[in-house]
Amino acid sequence: MISLIGKNLTAGYGGVDIINNIHLSVKEGEITVIVGPNGAGKSTVMKSLLGMLNLTEGNVIFSDNEITQMLPQDRVKLGIAFVPQNQNVFTGMSVEENLEMGGFLRKDNILETIEEIYQLFPVL
């Protein structure tokens, strides 16, 4: 089942489009990576999906619900998140403590999710 869809995403900064007509779909449970050179629009795509950057065209759909106009903090509550390319972690904290910080808005117990992450990435 496809859980997150970006249709015809067009967005940019200062009136200049950085991404144009991007289509993206992610199935439930998938880990998705966007790879490309500096300035290719990777962060722009992610910011658009998260609502941190307004689209000039396109739609974002999550679990069959239109969320294009939804605030970023409400998208996080749905479980939509990304890890930016910069080193945006708390260096004085352990991996587990950083994961807990990332899940602070969740209402459920995140311990099961953290265990799944350790199974996926045992080197952590």
Please report, for each region that a protein language model flagged, where it lies by residue.
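Short coil-to-beta microelement around the adenine-binding A-loop and adjacent beta1/P-loop entry
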Residues: 16-17, 74
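Helix-to-loop junction immediately C-terminal to a conserved catalytic motif
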Residues: 50
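Conserved Walker
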Residues: 43-44
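Short beta-strand immediately N-terminal to the Walker A/P-loop
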Residues: 32-33, 82
